[in-house]
């Protein structure tokens, strides 16, 4: 008999995943190998890679930078223990360009974004949209990098940087915010800062997110299902960040619902599930199968009771 005795069976190791709005501290940014091992109590075979050379559909090479923000959930606030969560933000040295509109995304020194034509950019004009309204942006803008808007939004929300303008319900438009000083509203990384990122120098972004070490920000956690293996991974929604004081998540919910509607209308499948509820442990709702007592439109005849078993 040539059969191995095998090994003792083991239970599958389960890792909890969480979904919903969660207050977090920033624990680290792009940790090196030693820092990563200490943070996550693990051992890495190689150092993390944060800058990669990529190639687009036209064969043009570009730099893709991953900014990994390691976040510590505020367990005192949420009332239960949670592990560290890593949020990846990606930026590239490509210009943010709208393929259909032909416009470029631009950003001013206050971290406001808009879309402008080449003619508007050349003339340094405030972009005007099809409805006749002018964009809420100053003319000191520059063309934005791909991924810059998400990164800027996180920095601005985490550091509690006020907006230079505010919404006026009577005028139905944005008006100057006279309650703040303009210099306190500045929030834009300059081109030189991005050039450092593309070279793998993250000292400046680490310094910026370290300005307010005790600050918290609320992020939306989700769970991504790998379509091939079915494994579940913790995810973070990077289109919307909320101040720690936020208690109304309606705008987040509208964005999540809009994403679902867009995917449905365009035949896309969303592999990540998010929730605008308060953070809680994620659980899969099992499919309920009901046995019908009636024989209704069955595609095949049901086997008769006297059919013999061919393998008996």
What are these regions (language model features)?
Residues 1-312:
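Short beta-rich binding modules
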């Amino acid at each position: 008999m040539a059969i191995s005795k095998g090994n003792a069976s083991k239970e599958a190791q389960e890792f909890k995943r969480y979904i919903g709005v969660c207050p977090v501290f920033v624990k680290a940014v792009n940790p090196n190998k030693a820092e990563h091992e200490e943070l996550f109590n693990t051992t890495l075979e190689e150092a993390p890679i944060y800058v990669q050379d990529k190639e687009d559909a036209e064969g043009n090479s570009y730099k893709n930078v991953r900014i990994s923000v390691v976040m510590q959930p505020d367990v005192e606030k949420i009332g239960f223990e949670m592990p560290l969560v890593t949020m990846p933000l990606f930026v590239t040295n490509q210009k943010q360009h709208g393929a259909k509109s032909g416009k470029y995304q631009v950003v001013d020194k206050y971290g406001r974004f808009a879309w402008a034509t080449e003619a508007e950019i050349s003339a340094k004009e405030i972009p005007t949209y099809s409805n006749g309204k002018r964009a809420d942006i100053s003319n000191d803008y520059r063309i934005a990098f791909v991924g810059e808007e998400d990164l800027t939004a996180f920095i601005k929300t985490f550091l509690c940087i006020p907006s230079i303008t505010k919404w006026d319900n009577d005028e139905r438009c944005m008006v100057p915010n006279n309650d703040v000083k303009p210099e306190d509203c500045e929030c834009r990384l300059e081109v030189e800062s991005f050039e450092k990122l593309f070279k793998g120098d993250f000292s400046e972004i680490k310094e910026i997110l370290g300005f307010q070490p005790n600050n918290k920000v609320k992020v939306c956690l989700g769970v991504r299902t790998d379509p091939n293996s079915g494994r579940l991974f913790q995810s973070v929604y990077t289109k919307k960040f909320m101040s720690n004081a936020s208690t109304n998540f309606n705008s987040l919910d509208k964005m999540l619902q809009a994403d679902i509607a867009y995917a449905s209308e365009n035949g896309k499948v969303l592999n990540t599930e998010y929730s605008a509820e308060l953070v809680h442990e994620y659980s899969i709702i099992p499919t309920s199968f009901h046995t019908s007592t009636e024989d209704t439109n069955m595609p095949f005849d049901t086997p008769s009771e006297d059919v013999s078993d061919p393998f008996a």
